[in-house]
A protein has these predicted regions:
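Conserved SAM-binding loop
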Residues: 101-222, 249-251
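N-terminal juxtadomain amphipathic helix
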Residues: 19-105
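Residues at structural and domain junctions
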Residues: 35, 64, 156, 175, ...
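Conserved phosphate-coordination/catalytic loops
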Residues: 84, 180, 246
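S-adenosyl-L-methionine-dependent methyltransferase catalytic module, highlighting the catalytic core
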Residues: 4-27, 31-47, 183-251
Length: 251
């Protein structure tokens, strides 16, 4: 994997121009996959899986697509680990760039996902949590039964109940866009990180926008939608989790 450090929107545009030929090759691959799916309900392609540390097959299908273009970010499911393209990419970056040790203390903003299970199987000191949007007693009982004997830990990323300076790494994948006060959440993350600790996060990102799109706001518990509501997958809720932002160059 080639990892490029880009600090602002101008550097991103320069990167696109310099790597135009390679980007055309990648878009050509995308085009071929989108053409093939028109005549196949689903199919597999061969490749190397970082999380499996071996060759694997990857599922291509139309789930989460917009009807015109495949959602390769959320699909390309590894046949061995069952992790999607985005998650495998994040772990590839995490382990290649940061080189974590097995005993490092890691906090993840997820607990019941396939990734959380994979991380706990590999690393010795992983702490995970979920955020209960529905904190009614009935919902908590349903979750208790569903995930028994595991105990789901609730954390609000804007007010974590951890001591300061305790984690080597914090991993948060597609979480911050669901937090109205995401900058407050970032401050909390840096509070619980050790000196020289590192945060790795992913968010849905509009590569063509220099500013954030505010999709919804919340005041005194009342949500005001500014665009068509967008919900992302949530393992704790069938409804999904409301996205308050599509982040851009000003995030």
């Amino acid at each position: 994997m080639h990892i490029n450090r880009i600090s602002n929107f101008k550097e991103y545009q320069s990167h696109i121009q310099k790597n135009n030929r390679q980007i055309k090759v990648l878009r050509g691959i995308d085009f071929k996959l989108n053409q093939k799916i028109k005549t196949h309900k689903q199919f597999y392609i061969d490749g190397y899986s970082w999380t499996a540390q071996s060759n694997s097959k990857f599922l291509v299908d139309t789930l989460y697509s917009n009807g015109n273009e495949l959602n390769l970010r959320e699909r390309l499911i590894c046949n061995k680990t069952k992790l999607n393209n985005r998650i495998r990419g994040c772990i590839h970056v995490f382990e290649t760039l940061f080189k974590p040790q097995l005993r490092d203390k890691i906090y993840m903003t997820e607990q019941v996902s396939l990734l959380a299970k994979w991380m706990n199987n590999k690393y010795d000191n992983v702490v995970g949590s979920e955020c209960f949007e529905d904190d009614t007693l009935m919902h908590k009982i349903k979750l208790l039964v569903k995930y028994f004997p595991s105990k789901i830990k609730h954390q609000d990323l804007t007010k974590l109940n951890f001591n300061s300076d305790i984690f080597n790494y914090v991993l948060s994948f597609d979480c911050f866009e669901h937090i109205p006060q995401y900058k407050k959440a970032l401050k909390e993350v840096f509070r619980v990180l050790k000196p020289n600790g590192k945060l790795l996060f992913s968010v849905p990102f509009d590569l063509n926008s220099q500013s954030n799109l505010v999709r919804a706001t919340i005041s005194e518990g009342e949500i005001k939608h500014l665009t068509t509501p967008e919900y992302h997958g949530d393992p704790l809720s069938k409804k999904g989790c409301l996205s308050f932002y599509t982040l851009g160059g000003s995030c």
